[in-house]
Design a protein with these regions (language model features):
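Extracytoplasmic/periplasmic, Sec-exported soluble proteins
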Residues: 23, 79, 89, 105-106, ...
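A small/polar (G/S/T-enriched), proline-flanked helix-loop surface module common
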Residues: 37-170
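A short, solvent-exposed beta-edge/loop patch
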Residues: 136-219
């Protein structure tokens, strides 16, 4: 079971948080059959819509976060029926902050705020892409504790659509976002399937790597 790692003496530094993220995140060569691109990088600061979602849900301010690092991006397949995967590691000041954020994010209010955020994001994207393929209706399903033996894990499964000018559905985009917490960190795996979902075997392989590294390292 992934539990709470004992904190190091004194506050966690940015350097410690980044080093932990680097030790846990997926890296080149981890996923056979996938090609990796770009280097691990610090995630951009949340935009206006994302900040509005956090305020709506009563979530923890991202200003309190010590570091959020995104892994290299893995891709496989053609443009249609392609697959994309990446991991993200967030480090916060204490396990209590992570626990509070995790509890709030699973409340019905937070789920409603997330749906509102996605709708607003899609509307803005469609305006920017006028005349090109539009984002259509979507569905969201949440699965609590999807990882056996792992406390405080979650899965958010999003099924998006892409529309032709006629309004007919051209493609489905399947986006699975897995997450779990350990000590002052939250680890996520995002798996995007174009045309069909990313195989569960590929998701399981990536998740096992992240779990093993999270248990083998401490902030």
């Amino acid at each position: 079971m992934v539990g709470v790692n004992p904190p190091a003496s004194g506050p966690i530094t940015k350097a410690q948080a980044v080093a932990y993220a680097h030790a846990v995140n997926l890296r080149a060569g981890d996923l056979p059959g996938f090609t990796s691109s770009r280097s691990e990088t610090e995630a951009p600061k949340p935009g206006q819509l994302a900040l509005e979602e956090i305020r709506c849900s009563g979530g923890v301010s991202p200003a309190r976060r010590i570091a959020k690092m995104e892994s290299t991006e893995f891709s496989s397949g053609r443009v249609f029926y392609g697959k994309v995967m990446k991991s993200t590691v967030e480090v916060w000041p204490t396990p209590a902050v992570v626990a509070s954020s995790n509890v709030l994010s699973h409340k019905s209010r937070a789920r409603a705020c997330f749906v509102r955020f996605l709708k607003a994001l899609h509307e803005r994207t469609n305006q920017e892409r006028k005349g090109r393929m539009q984002i259509g209706p979507f569905t969201i399903a949440t699965v609590p504790n999807p990882l056996p033996g792992v406390s405080d894990s979650f899965l958010t499964a999003i099924n998006e659509t892409r529309l032709l000018r006629s309004g007919a559905i051209r493609a489905h985009i399947y986006r699975d976002i897995f997450g779990f917490t350990t000590g002052p960190a939250e680890i996520e795996l995002e798996a995007i399937g174009i045309g069909r979902p990313v195989p569960t075997s590929a998701e399981a392989q990536a998740l096992q790597l992240l779990l093993d590294r999270a248990m083998a390292n401490t902030v």
